[in-house]
Regions:
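Juxtamembrane inter-helical linkers in multi-pass membrane proteins
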Residues: 1, 74-98, 141-143, 184-197
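Extended, low-charge hydrophobic alpha-helical regions
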Residues: 2-16, 119-250
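Juxtamembrane/interface segments at transmembrane-helix termini
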Residues: 65-79, 129-135, 265-268
């Protein structure tokens, strides 16, 4: 909805700038990641840590907006004037038709992209070189996750399980938590015992509070979910712009997590 709301901006350049920074605002799906990791690794200040991620997102959006503003030609200024109509009781039939048209438009355009991407993600998570698998460790996703380990190691996320969880998070950010639960063999991540077990497993691999915060920062800034990507494609009418945004967010997420991990490791 936030991306689609940019239609109210008359200038195409302003729309693209707004679409670029909108994904940096934390959604409710990311909150599940913050709550889980903050509660496990920052038990005394979990709420402050979770709130800090929201502030990081806002600060990053402002910074990127300022940089883009200075890099582009801004000679033309547009005053956003919206004529407010007279308030009236809406006609239910008119509202129903309007809502149906929007839903149909979304399902036929953005929904198609979401469906295809979901099939691809399901395939790589459930199929491996030997065919259909019962253990995710044998899947194509796990193989790809192992390839990503050297890339993610400098940011403190050097395990294939975390890499696969991040890949699955492209479908929906809350899936990162459930994927980590499955990949690390946790029965019920929503219980105190499950969280303690996952914390113990991660701690045994050298995963500290610094790694946890780096992971939260990465989840905040990296590629948004499929639905958002599809909506961006629909609003910009450009795969080049959409894929460019995805790559930019990946690089930004890696860079920010790198700074957090490297600086944090030296200070704590």
């Amino acid at each position: 909805p936030a991306v689609m709301a940019t239609r109210a901006l008359e200038n195409q350049r302003d729309r693209l700038k707004t679409i670029l920074i909108t994904p940096f605002m934390s959604c409710s799906a990311r909150l599940t990641i913050y709550v889980l990791l903050a509660d496990m690794f920052f038990p005394k200040s979990a709420m402050l840590v979770a709130y800090s991620l929201y502030l990081v997102g806002v600060a990053m959006a402002i910074l990127i907006a300022l940089i883009v503003h200075r890099m582009t030609d801004n000679k033309t200024e547009n005053a956003l004037l919206i004529e407010l109509p007279e308030y009236k009781i809406p006609n239910l039939r008119t509202v129903a038709i309007y809502v149906w048209e929007k839903i149909k438009d979304y399902l036929t355009k953005a929904g198609t992209t979401i469906f295809l991407a979901s099939i691809i993600l399901w395939f790589v998570m459930n199929v491996g070189p030997a065919g259909f698998i019962s253990d995710v460790a044998d899947s194509f996703a796990a193989k790809f996750g192992q390839i990503l380990v050297p890339v993610l190691k400098p940011v403190g996320l050097g395990s294939w399980q975390i890499a696969v969880a991040l890949i699955s998070g492209i479908s929906a950010k809350e899936v990162v938590v459930s994927s980590m639960s499955v990949l690390y063999g946790i029965g019920n991540i929503n219980s105190a015992a499950g969280m303690a077990e996952l914390s113990g497993i991660l701690g045994g691999t050298g995963f500290t509070s610094v790694n946890a915060y780096a992971l939260m920062v990465f989840c905040l800034l990296y590629t948004p979910c499929i639905a958002t990507i599809a909506t961006i494609k629909r609003e910009t009418q450009s795969w080049r712009w959409t894929l460019g945004m995805v790559m930019f967010q990946l690089v930004l997420a890696w860079s920010a997590a790198f700074l957090v991990f490297q600086i944090g490791s030296r200070l704590f």
